[in-house]
Swiss-Prot record:
Claim: Transcription is one of the keywords in the record: no
Signal peptide range in chain numbering: 1-19
Keywords: Disulfide bond, Glycoprotein, Repeat, Secreted, Signal
Transferrin-like domain sequence ranges: 25-347, 355-685
SMART domains (alphabetical): TR_FER
Posttranslational modification: N-glycosylated.
Effect after changing residue 207 to Y: Confers ability to bind ferric iron and carbonate
Protein name (record): Inhibitor of carbonic anhydrase
Provenance organism: Mus musculus (Mouse)
Gene Ontology MF term list: enzyme inhibitor activity
Gene: Inhca
Family designation: Belongs to the transferrin family.
Cystines in this chain: 28-67, 38-58, 137-213, 172-188, 175-198, 185-196, 246-260, 358-390, 368-381, 415-695, 438-658, 470-545, 494-686, 504-518, 515-528, 585-599
Amino acid sequence: MRLLICALLCLGTLGLCLALPEKTIRWCVVSDHEATKCSSFRDNMKKVLPAGGPAVTCVRKMSHPECIRDISANKVDAVTVDGALVAEADLPHHSLKPIMAEYYGSKDDPKTHYYVVAMAKKGTGFQLNQLRGKKSCHTGLGWSAGWYVPLSTLLPSGSRETAAATFFSSSCVPCADGKMFPSLCQLCAGKGTDKCACSSREPYFGSWGALKCLQDGTADVSFVKHLTVFEAMPTKADRDQYELLCMDNTRRPVEEYEQCYLARVPSHVVVARSVDGKEDSIQELLRVAQEHFGKDKSSPFQLFGSPHGEDLLFTDAAHGLLRVPRKIDISLYLGYEFLSAFRNLKRGLEDSQRVKWCAVGQQERTKCDQWSAVSGGALACATEETPEDCIAATMKGEADAMSLDGGFAYVAGHCGLVPVLAENYLSTHSSGRLGSKCVNAPLEGYYVVAVVKKSDVGITWKSLQGKKSCHTAVGTSEGWNVPMGLIYNQTGSCKFDAFFSRSCAPGSDPDSPLCALCVGGNNPAHMCAANNAEGYHGSSGALRCLVEKGDVAFMKHPTVLQNTDGKNPEPWAKGLKHEDFELLCLDGTRKPVTEAQSCHLARVPNRAVFSRKDKADFVRRILFNQQELFGRNGFEYMMFQMFESSAKDLLFSDDTECLSNLQNKTTYKTYLGPQYLTLMDNFRQCLSSELLDACTFHKY
């Protein structure tokens, strides 16, 4: 009986019982043709994989959405899909993750994206804004190229199948419900139950099928990947029979797709479970597969092609697979522009009546909740553990805004966020407060300084090696990027844990020498945390670290003056005078802390509020309104103070006079300026930012 059961299981999964489950990669296939190719994949991998390595089995399902659900349910392990289908599946948060991305172009210049184009026969005359009432062919319901991109371009937000069915006279949208929306399946060519099927059983399924629908004269317009056009029509003579419909309501030749497309979309991607997903085994399997059966290999079996049909297991146009950085989840992979269109179509327009501020750590969350309570519904709060987590949350639409130091602004800019307003500081204006003029006052930036105790007379900038150092946090301008960038220029090494004897650099590995001086907080888990739970976090925390344990501290230039001479009532600052400290100058001399203008490491941009492009104007309006109520001269200043905190620098810097206009510096590059960008670009190889790696994975 046990043998009979195993035999039946093996028939259902094409050999699942022949390998140990923990060594088996269960690949999901959606058609007989894919099952045939997958069987060849399995058999050929047996020849090249080492003994004891992962084995491939093939599991037949009816559609890619079913594959996605079954990966989440641990019934299969992997499939290559359009990332939008994962977002569409509405699975538990982060249950699946992208692990290997198809790339196009050369190995030296891989492109992990493609262009979605609207294609029509030459001479048909209509433009993109004249598609109402036309016949259309689509790759499939829920797919980027054939569904979300054209619908978000052509139809009002919140519209989906119903609106598409009324917009076009008739269509072929494989995977659609033909009973509920008969016009969406009217043009499909499948017979019987195969009509409008969610696999190659429907001849017009996928990008190749949607193009064939146009070639057969079935439709007036087809929405496809540009790659498919060049694969299916290798000669210019064939392509010259068609034209692309452009966003400016003109037409262009097919060759000009880079100037005439609807959207640029991330490539198809191999997905697996986020937990116990066999990620390493799948990546190793595909690495070996590419080495033996990849593009331009002479083997009869081809990973990116098949005699049995098009785009089986992988896209035929793919040149290879790239490992996706671990930080990237499906939201980061797809990007906020695509997700914005996706969310609008799926749920309708987002609620734009309030700003969701991202607080870093519990202390900031407490202040944010106080602000939210008096904001009149204009502000809500989200919480993350690090500034980079807040950047990621904002990209995904889980938060809307936060104030960032220049170092994190550099990361946010690479992730597609934009500056909205800048902090303008009291200390930069010799004449005192600017009042109502502050919002348009020049942004002067601040100095990054290296501070030592006056009594440590032997320490200079040139004798820091082996000393104990205090840093605001890893990734910040004043505490890390500027001083470590200068040290890197001198040593050529990113091993900063070997340069200093011990340090407190919040955000580092808690077990490294870079956290050896940190004090943590009430919870041992807060040791070296990249937020205010670490007592030595921030500029004031770095000064405290210097007072209690360190030899040198890196901070903003006003910090010593803000925490001495009775200005800070905390026990560690009691009795401190600003004369107790000195600045280290780059020429090896030292100066009083009041002379930062002539003795500093660099001048860097002020902190700035960052948001998504689609939310930036709204965030700006809300913050100006809140500032009128709770800013330095606000009408409700006694109820809540935006720029004062129970701890140091919560949500905003405590020395902020106001949030100011950017004065035409509306991109992260123009805001940060060429000098800071050069510093960061030179220092980039020393940046341990998984998010920066994730946001620069797609090379546009």
